[in-house]
A protein has these predicted regions:
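Alpha-helical transmembrane bundles and membrane-interface segments of multipass inner-membrane proteins
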Residues: 1-199
Length: 199
């Protein structure tokens, strides 16, 4: 903490950038899903051999095809997350720019998957990482995952709030070290006085 400088962005910047980033994630997500559904079950394209394939999967669960059978519950949860992010962006007194971008990506991805669940009853997944045993995912999932990472990095390393906490901890550590030095000096003086009295 305390590394780098990132002043708290004004509310207009927060809302403008957050809205723009969320919209980009949402549009890319929905357009790619539209293209995948247009091809349908016949879709199976090797993008990078042994690494990435494209194939159409109907996901009735959460992100990365997990939690199947609870689609509506996840849609409600996604809407709650979106509302929480919006409130935080408006009310937080101190934010890093990267926090805003990250949370906007999360919101855009959450909206994208929520639209699928509410309109079709499933989420369109199509990106398969064939080099590992991993669930099929989509652009919204990428936005959510990358957004969480960026928001955490922004909060822990760049936000003014984090720097204030770091500065307070540093001051407390200095005060504690100073108090220990003074206690040691008092102990040394007391020992010398005792030695003189014993003589």
């Amino acid at each position: 903490m305390g590394r780098g400088a990132d002043m708290t962005p004004p509310l207009r910047w927060r809302l403008g950038v957050a809205g723009g980033v969320a919209l980009v994630v949402l549009l890319v997500d929905q357009l790619t899903k539209l293209a995948v559904r247009a091809v349908g079950d016949a879709l199976h394209v090797t993008v990078i051999p042994g690494v990435i394939d494209f194939l159409f999967v109907r996901n009735i669960g959460a992100a990365f095809s997990m939690g199947e059978g609870h689609g509506i519950a996840f849609a409600v949860l996604a809407l709650a997350v979106i509302i929480a992010i919006a409130v935080y962006l408006v009310r937080a007194p101190q934010l890093a720019h990267l926090e805003v971008v990250g949370m906007a990506m999360v919101a855009g991805g959450a909206v994208g998957n929520a639209i699928d669940r509410l309109t079709m009853g499933f989420v369109t997944d199509f990106i398969a990482a064939t080099f590992i045993d991993f669930p099929v995912f989509n652009v919204a999932d990428i936005g959510i995952t990358v957004g969480v990472v960026l928001a955490l990095i922004g909060y822990m390393f760049l936000s003014p709030a984090a720097r204030e906490v770091d500065a307070t901890a540093e001051l407390n550590a200095r005060d504690e070290a100073r108090a220990k030095r003074k206690a040691k000096q008092r102990g040394e003086r007391a020992r010398k006085i005792r030695e003189r009295n014993e003589r």
